[in-house]
């Protein structure tokens, strides 16, 4: 009899263990997606996201200012200066969350033009060709002091509205086109992030299965790679906003993290870049205490730490730089049957060549994914997910490039870009939205078979049919 009782008890325990393994405990993780947003409201055309922890955010859609393969070093530094200016404008209690969404698509002509036979055949040739596209969003979030939850402060709210418009004006003055997402657009963007689907017109949600390495959802899975391991920060001593590659024995500058748009097998990549703006006086005081603590125990590692802190304090005093808490992660989405280890190997090898060793202990996959939702960045763990650095150094790790797109011009001359898909350019430099010159003369020169006849045919069509 005792044996039967023991066997029944063991069977019950096995059943409970199987249930917990398959369906979870039904605790906090079960409702983790329900505990993010309170609502999304419209405020004078701006979609404002309210989180259940009391923060509110606005989303700016923008285009990165540096054209890929432009070899313009100054433009990389100009972006760093712009970001430093935005940090100064926002000040304490705000966070800047930049999301670069890299998407693998198939080419299709969406111009809705009634092409003649020759042009129609041209576009049919490229239909279905895979290429990489990119979208960029900048999310401004105001922190809510947890002790003041459920107490509305009209002054802070008005300050938030003023500052987000200041940010938009600053970016416009710097030549970076931006616009705020409305309420419906913000909702769609959040849904697309949740579904990890940025290319289909209709999206659907699926069940999530989470383990220590990946997050599976329907016919796809993703993995979150934290760029910096807080316990052992492996970054180069000197960071620049660009790195050099060799092209035909010539050095060419590219973005420091340009590798994010060429990850093998990836269908979608989201590069999350977060800057949290703390109280500067408090952080300097904490740095001073840390320096004194290291100095009280003289050994080689502590002496190096003291020297590093002194250098930072000297830069802040001389150049009025700002301290920020930072977090960077990559969310890589692949088909369910793809080998995610290939993406891991590619990222580890590529970043190690830059002197950056990505974290191998990002076991909190679900928490990193949820805290990377637009407007939910303050959910990042203060002790484990954020590290303190200067705003200039953090800006170097941001993605600054955009892929060349079709120009806004009535004189569209199509050539293929480096990915092999048609892109329209204005060869005159004076008909498009962005004027390069007010007068231009040109002639067509090229060897046999290079496309001179087709080129002149397009120009004749546009000019003599009065399409300009």
Locate the predicted segments by residue:
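Glycine-rich phosphate-binding loop of nucleotide-binding enzymes
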Residues: 49, 65, 73, 80-88, ...
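Pre-P-loop entry segment of helicase/translocase ATPase cores
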Residues: 387-399, 403-422
């Amino acid at each position: 009899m005792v044996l039967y009782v023991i066997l029944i008890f063991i069977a019950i325990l096995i059943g409970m263990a199987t249930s917990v393994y398959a369906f979870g405990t039904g605790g906090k993780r079960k409702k983790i997606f329900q505990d993010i947003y309170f609502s999304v409201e419209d405020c004078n055309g701006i979609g404002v996201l309210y989180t259940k922890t009391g923060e509110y955010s606005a989303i700016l859609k923008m285009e990165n200012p540096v054209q890929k393969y432009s070899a313009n070093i100054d433009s990389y530094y100009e972006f760093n200066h712009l970001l430093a200016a935005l940090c100064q404008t926002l000040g304490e209690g705000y966070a800047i969350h930049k999301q670069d969404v890299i998407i693998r698509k198939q080419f299709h002509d969406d111009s809705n033009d009634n092409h003649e036979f020759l042009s129609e055949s041209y576009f049919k040739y490229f239909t279905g060709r895979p290429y990489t596209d990119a979208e960029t969003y900048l999310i401004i979030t105001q922190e809510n002091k947890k002790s003041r939850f459920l107490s509305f402060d009209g002054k802070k709210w008005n300050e938030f509205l003023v500052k987000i418009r200041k940010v938009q004006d600053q970016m416009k003055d710097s030549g970076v086109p931006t616009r705020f997402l409305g309420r419906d657009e913000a909702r769609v963007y959040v849904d697309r992030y949740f579904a990890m689907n940025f290319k289909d017109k209709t999206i659907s949600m699926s069940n999530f299965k989470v383990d220590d390495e990946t997050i599976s959802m329907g016919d796809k899975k993703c993995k979150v790679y934290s760029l910096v391991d807080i316990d052992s920060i492996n970054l180069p001593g000197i960071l620049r906003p660009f790195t050099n590659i060799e092209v035909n024995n010539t050095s060419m500058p590219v973005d420091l993290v340009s590798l994010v748009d060429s990850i093998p097998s990836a269908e979608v990549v989201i590069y999350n870049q977060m800057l949290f703006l703390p109280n500067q006086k408090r952080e300097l005081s904490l740095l001073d205490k840390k320096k004194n603590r290291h100095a009280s125990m003289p050994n080689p590692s502590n002496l190096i730490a003291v020297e590093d802190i002194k250098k930072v304090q000297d830069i802040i005093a001389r150049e009025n730089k700002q301290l920020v808490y930072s977090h960077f992660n990559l969310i890589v989405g692949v088909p369910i049957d793809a080998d995610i280890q290939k993406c891991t190997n590619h990222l580890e090898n590529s970043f190690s060549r830059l002197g950056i060793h990505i974290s191998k202990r990002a076991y909190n996959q679900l928490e990193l994914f949820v805290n990377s939702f637009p407007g939910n960045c303050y959910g990042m763990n203060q002790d484990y997910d954020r590290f303190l650095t200067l705003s200039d150094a953090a800006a170097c790790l941001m993605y600054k490039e955009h892929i060349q797109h079709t120009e806004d011009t009535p004189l569209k001359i199509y050539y293929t870009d480096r990915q092999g898909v048609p892109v329209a350019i204005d060869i005159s430099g004076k008909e498009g939205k962005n004027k390069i010159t007010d007068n231009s003369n040109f002639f067509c020169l090229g060897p046999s078979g290079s496309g001179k006849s087709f080129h002149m045919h397009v120009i004749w069509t546009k000019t003599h049919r009065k399409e300009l």
